[in-house]
Amino acid sequence: MPSIKITSGGYEFLAETHPDAPQTVEAFLKLLPYRQKIIHVRWSGEACWVPLGEFQLLRGDAPVGFENHTSHPSVGDVLFYPGPYSETEILLAYGSCCFASKMGQLAGNHSLTIVQGKENLRALGVKTLWEGAQEVLFELA
């Protein structure tokens, strides 16, 4: 499966796509290059997120559903939450994390895992917490 380069806050990361989330990966790859803003989470602990509102990640004409989903990502795991209980989002864990929103615990599709640059994730998280929103770019490596 292809690798994704993630650039944010002056840091570069290399992520591998997850074979257990093929629908999410297939649909997300069609968006690349994908540029957005990343902010610090409010409810989930040590993570940053890309709020996507009502956006739906589509595979063909159908929204991507849950696959390989978890509420407890490890450092370097990237989750795509397809909704519908909270807004659609991308979550990037840099430390201890229990994925949640104001309505309670959520589970997102573990679709990417950072394999290079992981040592800079905490620095990105702290920068995002104290300096605010950062540009983030997802592109094919």
Q: Which residue stretches match the model-derived regions?
A:
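Glycine-rich active-site loops that engage anionic ligands at enzyme catalytic sites
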Residues: 16-141
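N-terminal intrinsically disordered, low-complexity, charge/repeat-rich segments that act as generic
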Residues: 1-20
